Amino acid sequence: HKEPKDTSVDAFAKVKRLTLSNQVIFHLKIRGFYGATNSELVAIIGGNPNSIQPRTADLSRASVPYVQEHPDGVKRKNAYDNDEIVWVLTPAGYEHYKTLEVR
């Protein structure tokens, strides 16, 4: 039986192997109804800040969208004091999350 620390390290390694779009879905699932802005996703996932916005745009505009703007229209301020859209998963996004190999 694995120690909890080993299990969390294994899970983190699996998340890092996901595509960027699937990492967005994974982290939005964790954040639930609170959601996340593009800036928050950059802080969580790391990498190039210009790579997250195209992923959330693609995921929200797909024929079956996996993410959507927060249903209450919630926005949060970023480091530059600008309002940012808060993204949450759609029901299809939750279903897709279940197929990810991180659980």
Predicted stretch roles:
Residues F26-K29, A57:
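Surface-exposed alpha-helical segments enriched in charged/polar residues
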Residues N22-F26, S39, Q53:
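Short amphipathic alpha-helical segments
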Residues G46-R61, V67-D72:
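Short amphipathic alpha-helical interaction segments
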Residues R17-L18, Y34-A36, Q53:
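Short glycine/proline-centered loop/turn elements that form peptide/ligand docking sites
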Residues F33-I44:
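Short acidic, hydrophobic short linear motifs in intrinsically disordered regions
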Residues P71-L100:
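Short, cationic-aromatic polyanion-contact patches
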Residues H1-H27:
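Short alpha-helical segments that sit at the start of domains
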